[in-house]
């Protein structure tokens, strides 16, 4: 395919147009008075959202060069979302600011490499300064505040706070759609382990790329399943029940995996295969945990059991299992309460006798998975559109809360970024490195400027007053008042803020150091078929 190439200023200008189109669409959602964006969907009603990464992923531009710029900013939002689960709009605003300030200087003759070096140095200093002013998050009330700020709902903050209290900060919390109008919290027994499906063709929800199995059987073995004949009798028995099957094995390969996938695609029966969690003796112990939780038996040579001889009585059962590409969650296993209690007691006794910190950590993980549970926040709303929007907000809030527990919090509303300006400005740099530092200094103001603008205030006035205010004091855009941000509950997780800044600086630097852009030329339209010889155009109605 032929390529279209742009160089230097032309290349950067085209990419920046794409950056602006995406950033201008996303940044209107920033802050407590941020607006919504309506996204057209191929099927069903439009999606109304203020979630930055959701908006960014939907944007596709016609011009190839502009689209590359937009996609790079979308990557900033996605990466920030992957790391911290929130802060995607802030990351987008920071990227646009660094790109614009940087482009002015590059166009004026500054060296892009020197600017990049200065940006990286200034960003690293800002991140260290953010960590230095972070405050740890502990207690139900503090956790509720973080969640409430992210979701813009005190009620959601209470749900997430209660869920984390009941299943632990690292417990499994899922978000589902409720059949009613009200949002509610349920905590159900369950277990999660870090192994996902072996083939993406096993998913039942192509949009979320997850496999949801209702009332499934569970085959648990430490063996490798390569020959489909080994489990064929068992598969035939499961097929008669018309219930799905989860296979947890050392591996599923050879002819077995494609055979299972083919039957899933054809709709013969629903099956998902995952690798067994852990390694060595720990794997055997975890498989036994799963078997006890689900009322099944581990098919292992240690017990003299073979796959080909396995019967339905060896299979575990559960009310529901959810499998994505990275993890499996088993909810309401059918194991007996007595057997589970005995297993928990055994693990506790091992905890008391072990002298290894590593073993203690792994035993505590197993104990939490057996004795803990899965918290389910069931989201209710009057309409499907409102339901989707609420789910996205709760997901953001949950991620932000976990990030806050992990690395602490700082004053929200962009206040912390203004606070660290003094540390960055103190950097003694020269030449283009100093120019890079100054670009970051200007970009650090941009989130506050945009939050104020979205709330109907003049950003420059707010920034000037903020720079001269006592530490911790900031502008509450929701009320127009100057308050102690942390005491008022306007807070941001450090992990979210630093990830947004680091990812924005990284991608913006790449755009500034771009000297050539190569894109596919659009395919020419196919010519219309030739008219047969001797045919009068008037025969076509004169058109």
From Swiss-Prot:
Together with its co-chaperonin GroES, plays an essential role in assisting protein folding. The GroEL-GroES system forms a nano-cage that allows encapsulation of the non-native substrate proteins and provides a physical environment optimized to promote and accelerate protein folding. It is an enzyme of class 5 (isomerase). InterPro entries: Chaperonin_Cpn60_CS, Cpn60/GroEL, Cpn60/GroEL/TCP-1, GroEL-like_apical_dom_sf, GROEL-like_equatorial_sf, TCP-1-like_intermed_sf. This is Chaperonin GroEL. It comes from Streptococcus pyogenes serotype M49 (strain NZ131). One of its GO terms (cellular component) is cytoplasm. Belongs to the chaperonin (HSP60) family. It is found in: Cytoplasm. GO terms for biological process: protein refolding. Its EC number is 5.6.1.7. Keywords: ATP-binding, Chaperone, Cytoplasm, Isomerase, Nucleotide-binding, Stress response. The lineage of its organism: Bacteria, Bacillati, Bacillota, Bacilli, Lactobacillales. One of its GO terms (molecular function) is ATP-dependent protein folding chaperone. PROSITE patterns: CHAPERONINS_CPN60. It catalyses: ATP + H2O + a folded polypeptide = ADP + phosphate + an unfolded polypeptide.
């Amino acid at each position: 395919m032929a390529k279209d190439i742009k160089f230097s200023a032309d290349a950067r200008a085209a990419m920046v147009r794409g950056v602006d189109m995406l950033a201008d669409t996303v940044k209107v959602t920033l802050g407590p008075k941020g607006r919504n964006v309506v996204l057209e969907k191929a099927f069903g009603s439009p999606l109304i959202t203020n979630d930055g990464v959701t908006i960014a992923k939907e944007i596709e531009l016609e011009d190839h060069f502009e689209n590359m710029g937009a996609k790079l900013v979308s990557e900033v939002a996605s990466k920030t979302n992957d790391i911290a689960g929130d802060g995607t709009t802030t990351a987008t605003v920071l990227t646009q600011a660094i790109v614009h300030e940087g482009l002015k200087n590059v166009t004026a003759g500054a060296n892009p490499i020197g600017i990049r070096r200065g940006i990286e140095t200034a960003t690293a200093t800002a991140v260290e300064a953010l960590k230095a002013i972070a405050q740890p998050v502990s207690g139900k009330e503090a956790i509720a505040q973080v969640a409430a700020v992210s979701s813009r709902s005190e009620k959601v903050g209470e749900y997430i706070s209660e869920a984390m209290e009941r299943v632990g900060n690292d417990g499994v919390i899922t978000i589902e759609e409720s059949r009613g109008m009200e949002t509610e919290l349920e905590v159900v027994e369950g277990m999660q382990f870090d192994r996902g499906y072996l083939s993406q063709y096993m998913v039942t929800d192509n949009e979320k790329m997850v496999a949801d199995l209702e009332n499934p059987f569970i085959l648990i073995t430490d063996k490798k399943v390569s020959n489909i004949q080994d489990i064929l009798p068992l598969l035939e028995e499961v097929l008669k029940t018309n219930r799905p099957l989860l296979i947890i094995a050392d591996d599923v390969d050879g002819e077995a995996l494609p055979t299972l996938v083919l039957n899933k695609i054809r709709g013969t029966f629903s099956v998902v295969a995952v690798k067994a969690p852990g390694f060595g003796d720990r794997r055997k112990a975890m498989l036994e945990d799963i078997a006890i939780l689900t009322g099944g038996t581990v098919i292992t040579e240690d017990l003299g059991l073979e796959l080909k001889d396995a019967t339905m009585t060896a299979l575990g059962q559960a009310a529901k299992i959810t499998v994505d590409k990275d993890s499996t969650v088993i909810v309401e296993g059918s194991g007996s309460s007595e057997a589970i209690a005995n297993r928990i007691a055994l693990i506790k006794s091992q905890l008391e006798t072990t002298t290894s910190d590593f073993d203690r950590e792994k035993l505590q993980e197993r104990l939490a998975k057996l004795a803990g549970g899965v918290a389910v926040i069931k989201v209710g709303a009057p309409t499907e559109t409102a339901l989707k929007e609420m789910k996205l907000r709760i997901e953001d809030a949950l991620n932000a809360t976990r990030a806050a527990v992990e690395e602490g919090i700082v004053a929200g509303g962009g206040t912390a970024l203004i606070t660290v300006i003094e540390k960055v400005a103190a950097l003694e740099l020269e030449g283009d490195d100093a120019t890079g530092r100054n670009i970051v200094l200007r970009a650090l103001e941009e989130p506050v400027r945009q939050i104020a603008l979205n709330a109907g205030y003049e950003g420059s006035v707010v920034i000037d007053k903020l720079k001269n205010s006592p530490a911790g004091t900031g502008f509450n855009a929701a009320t127009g008042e100057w308050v102690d941000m942390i005491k008022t509950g306007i807070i941001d997780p450090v992990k979210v803020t630093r990830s947004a800044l680091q990812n924005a600086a990284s991608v913006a630097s790449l755009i500034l150091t771009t000297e050539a852009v190569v894109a596919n030329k659009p395919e020419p339209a196919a010519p219309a078929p030739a008219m047969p010889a001797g045919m009068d155009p008037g025969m076509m109605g004169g058109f």
